[in-house]
Amino acid sequence: VHCKPRQIGDSTVGNAWNFSYGYRCLDPIRTLIMANDADATDSLFRCLKHFHDSLPSVLKRPLKRSNRKELEFADTGVIWRCLTAGGRGQGRAWTHQRLHADEVAFWPNDESVWASVTSTLHEGPHKQIFVTSTPNGPGGLYHRLVMQAMADPATCFRFFRWADHAAYRMRPPADWEPTQEEADLASLHGLDILQLYWRHQKIWGGQGI
């Protein structure tokens, strides 16, 4: 379970991990990739297809199918399927060994979708669930999964601070001064003035949240 800021490439990492696993696997495993909306589903499928298309010709496994948000190897029968949370079916007609649940905090009907997709998972040596999302406030499925992951030694939980990423910085005007609350946050979390102003703009700026 990963808790992350936006646009650090974590969804791509999850996609790459599942593609690498499926590429090396000789069993006909199926991986379900579930995104929060149609645009994200399209993006994840394009990323998956790019991994295959970018391989040297000598390393490319032959494809049986590469359409309808599905990628299937002809030789091993390995399949990746990309679906949108809340869409028709939720993959219930299939059995999967692996699940990449992306941006879970923004899934519509999150608990219902989660119950549906996890019921398709086959218990066995290939089973793995990879959950990644930007937080969306307390409560809901993703908050529950994070709290469970933090308490469960059998689950790998990773928290990625936005302040650890160089893109989240903005130079303030010369006359800008942080509020006392912002100064306290800077002291508590070790933020510099560029990070603090970036945060300020994201909350109070014209293009912020």
Task: For each feature predicted by the language model, list its residue ranges.
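Phosphate/NTP-binding elements of NTP-utilizing enzymes
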Residues: 1-209
